[in-house]
């Protein structure tokens, strides 16, 4: 279980032992950890403390499909991306329940093009819903100004947009751009978009537009967009 927890956090044992030397004594059976030491260990590897007492490692599945530019769906992602997705799913669940309990209607554009993949038609509907004229971005001097304007229109329609490059507010847990440029959690009441703000502004705009298309087609997903190309997958094309 200890080795699994270390690997899950993205370390190998020798590298982790440099940060946490006592782990070698535990793995070799020379000493047994105290409860306090196990609590410290669980924090180092970003693992719920109770997991350490399970008879075997739990089967953790990706919470959403995660597309790689090489055409494959990932079967594993880094722990920082994984934890960020779970964190935002919990926030989304709370907001969705709040909106439903207070009789807010579902958002009509979510999944509107679920069985259609006409890109021009989808883009036109997105622009119409967000009330953006053609070539709207050309009226702004910088990518930041254009992005601020776009996000204002997006959030006005009920889409939650989060920009972050770390897990919550933990600066020791960065989210690498080459692993995750963003992800979208589709829901008819509370769609969430996450954008890695460690990325270039132009790349962030690409991610935002791509995530909007996923909301309109009704598919949650994460992306790496290496070389700013979508994955070779029917959902992505």
Indicate where each model-derived feature is located.
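Short juxta-domain linker segments that transition from a proline/glycine-rich
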Residues: 1-237
């Amino acid at each position: 279980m200890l080795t699994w927890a270390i690997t899950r956090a993205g370390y190998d044992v020798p590298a982790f032992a440099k940060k946490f030397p006592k782990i070698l004594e535990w793995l070799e059976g020379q000493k047994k950890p105290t409860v306090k030491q196990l609590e410290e260990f669980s924090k180092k590897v970003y693992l719920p403390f109770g997991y350490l007492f399970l008879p075997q490692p739990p089967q953790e599945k990706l919470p959403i499909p995660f597309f790689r530019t090489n055409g494959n769906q990932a079967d594993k992602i880094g722990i920082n991306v994984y934890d960020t997705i779970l964190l935002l799913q919990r926030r989304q669940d709370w907001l969705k329940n709040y909106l439903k309990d207070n009789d807010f209607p579902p958002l009509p554009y979510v999944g509107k093009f679920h069985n259609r993949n006409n890109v021009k038609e989808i883009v036109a509907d997105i622009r119409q819903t967000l009330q953006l004229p053609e070539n709207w971005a050309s009226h702004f001097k910088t990518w930041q100004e254009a992005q601020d304007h776009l996000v204002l229109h997006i959030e006005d329609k009920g889409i939650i947009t989060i920009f972050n490059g770390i897990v919550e507010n933990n600066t020791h847990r960065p989210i690498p751009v080459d692993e995750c440029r963003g992800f979208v959690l589709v829901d008819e009441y509370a769609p969430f978009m996450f954008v890695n703000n460690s990325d270039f502004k132009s790349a962030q705009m690409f991610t935002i537009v791509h995530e909007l298309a996923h909301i309109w087609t009704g598919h949650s997903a994460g992306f790496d967009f290496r070389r700013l190309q979508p994955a070779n997958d029917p959902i992505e094309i």
